[in-house]
Amino acid sequence: MIPVEALTPFEARIEHAELVETIARWDEAYHAKDAPEVPDDVYDGAKRRLARIEGRFPELAAKSPIRDKVGAAPSEGFGKLVHAVPMLSLDNAFAPEDVAEFDAKVRRFLGLGDEAPLAYVAEPKIDGLSINLRYEGGRFVSAATRGDGAEGEDVTRNLETFPATQLPRTLGPDAPAVIEIRGEVYMTKADFLALNQRQEAAGEKLFANPRNAAAGSLRQLDPKVTASRPLSLFAYAMGEASAPPAASHWEYLERLKAWGFVVNPLIRRCDGVAGLLSAYESLGEARATLAYDIDGIVYKVDDIELQRRLGFVSRSPRWAIAHKFPAEQATTLLEAIDIQVGRTGALTPVARLTPVNVGGVVVSNATLHNEDEIARKDVRIGDTVIVQRAGDVIPQIVGVVPGKPRGAVPFVYPETCPVCGAHAVRPEGEVIRRCTGGLTCEAQAKERLKHFVSRNAFDIEGLGEKNIEFLWEKGWVRGPADIFRLKARNDAELLQRLENFEGWGKRSTEKLFESIKTRSAMGLERFIFALGIRQIGEATAKRLARHYGSFGAWRAAMLAGTEEARAELTSIEDIGPSVAGDLLDFFSEEHNVQAVDDLVAAMAALDGAVEDAKVIESSASPVAGKAVVFTGTLVTMTRPEAKARAEALGAKVVGSVSKKTDYVVVGADAGSKAAEAVKLGIATLSEQEWLALTGAAD
């Protein structure tokens, strides 16, 4: 694999798109299906390489639909519970330098010097399923999985099967009126082996690893199944609390123990980077002897007030990080190389392997990245290959064991699409070959439809991949608008009505049509994401929706064709020339505009519409939706802290002053931005005036 530092812009752009698509697929398998396709450290490695590429090429950051994403949408088999405080994931560290950089970032954000005391808590990172337990008036009332971070699955009845020694039903009189306690449901190694022995004896499917077994056991529609499984629970974090139960995380853990929760006995309190690395080394040495699986150690700033000040960025807290353990390797046989065609036409090679256990997880597929990598490593069908679960690279075949089998020939990369037969071209300087068939390519068209109905797009219940394939083969659905005309078409049929086909039935067909009608009203950000425009992920779609506000305004801006419209587009956070180019190119094609308008019309025919973007209203914040510029040196907070607070109130913090700026907050030694604000007649505020406006003044 080419080192990130050596990637050309073309190579970075193509690998970035490949990483985004791969990670999104893994997220769905891991969080929604409890069937991880790759080991955790392979996944972490892909995320880390993605972050390194985005760090070197910042303009690519907006191309990540998984950038701000946590988990996956809750399963439709369970009710949903909204998390009052989002359940976010953690950034990762893989080397001592990463830990030192984490500590340095915390200190910079808080304005602390290198020698200032800063305490942390180091906790084993349990490999299980995260859970949120809500108590009101000291009594257990509900439990939810992480889900997509904003809302999770209601598994209250399943948690009620846990013994009181694992899950206290009541807390002490000192508990806040409302408190959410977070932890990890896991399965010990011994219990996992015993469960699989019972599964095998009963002729049932075996679980791949303890984490998968724990997740599958907890997410059962029948609580009796959960009760029959040997699950355990460690408590370690806090969600919503009506009053702070402790001043530090360490004190909070002590409070959890007093309330009857099991807290991991290996948790340590540490000072500075040296203390964190010492805890990491000690835990790494003990890892093999533990009764349960861990995949790293989590470091948290101990002081809860400092945690509050540090806040969150994107999908993770600034005050915590996960330090992961190193990679593992195994050898296996490469049985075949398949070429997959994605919705953007990218031809991606996938290695089909004889299943092999790599560090406790069965791996049967691995990416081969692109044709250059296949040629560079001289990977051939029939080779014995080295599969790596890696800490800093994408899941991959890292090498070939010497001694190729007789008759093995070099792999010839196709120059035509394996699905539609159209030319597959590779522009000069790029590493990805793409099908030129566009929407005439069945693979691309079907993949776009699957994307359109997916959980984070239109999320149409009853219209999964299998049913999309069926409707495509029947010729009833060839584009998004056809979905919203499906009932009318079905009603007009005399013989081939949907409910008459095997696997459908009257009730399931009615439910599908009800779901389609419900989804005929859709928020702008999901609508934009669902279109499947290249490089437009969930995060970018959300920024576009919030910026333009309505479908009409967004459509008009995309079709304006003026330099002013392009400049406005690139002024949006994380949208650079490349992303803007793909957006405008999409709308420059008349058939795309027609398809979008046709979709909106079909939605309207069912009394639906594309709904305007919701304006963030944080406690009726007076700055919600306002564009704010900070300039000069601030006194009461650091610049990153000011930005984080403003965004938490719904403001849009921008880096330059323009006619669209609402406020310029002027600190000491302000430069040209303050002068530009005066010139344009934009309101300027002192730091104290800003604090007074936002209700943060003393």
UniProtKB/Swiss-Prot annotation:
SUPFAM superfamilies from the UniProt entry: BRCT domain, DNA ligase/mRNA capping enzyme, catalytic domain, Nucleic acid-binding proteins, RuvA domain 2-like
EC number: 6.5.1.2
InterPro entries associated with the record: BRCT_dom (IPR001357), BRCT_dom_sf (IPR036420), DisA/LigA_HHH (IPR041663), DNA_ligase (IPR001679), DNA_ligase_AS (IPR018239), DNA_ligase_CS (IPR033136), DNAligase_adenylation (IPR013839), DNAligase_N (IPR013840)
GO biological process: DNA repair; DNA replication
Catalyzed chemical reaction(s): NAD(+) + (deoxyribonucleotide)n-3'-hydroxyl + 5'-phospho-(deoxyribonucleotide)m = (deoxyribonucleotide)n+m + AMP + beta-nicotinamide D-nucleotide
UniProt key word Hydrolase: no
Enzyme class: ligase
SMART domains the record matches: BRCT, HhH1, LIGANc
Sites where the protein binds NAD(+): D40, D41, V42, Y43, D44, S89, L90, E123, R146, E184, K300, K324
GO cellular component, one term: cytosol
Residues that hold Zn(2+) according to the record: C417, C420, C435, C441
Residues in BRCT domain copies: 618-698
Highest taxon of the lineage: Bacteria
GO MF annotations in UniProt: DNA binding; DNA ligase (NAD+) activity; metal ion binding
Enzyme active site: K125 (n6-amp-lysine intermediate)
CDD domains, per database record: BRCT_DNA_ligase_like, LIGANc
Keywords per UniProt: DNA damage, DNA repair, DNA replication, Ligase, Magnesium, Manganese, Metal-binding, NAD, Zinc
Co-factor requirement: Mg(2+); Mn(2+)
Family membership noted in the UniProt record: Belongs to the NAD-dependent DNA ligase family. LigA subfamily.
Role description: DNA ligase that catalyzes the formation of phosphodiester linkages between 5'-phosphoryl and 3'-hydroxyl groups in double-stranded DNA using NAD as a coenzyme and as the energy source for the reaction. It is essential for DNA replication and repair of damaged DNA.
Protein name: DNA ligase
Source organism (scientific name): Paramagnetospirillum magneticum (strain ATCC 700264 / AMB-1)
Gene field: ligA
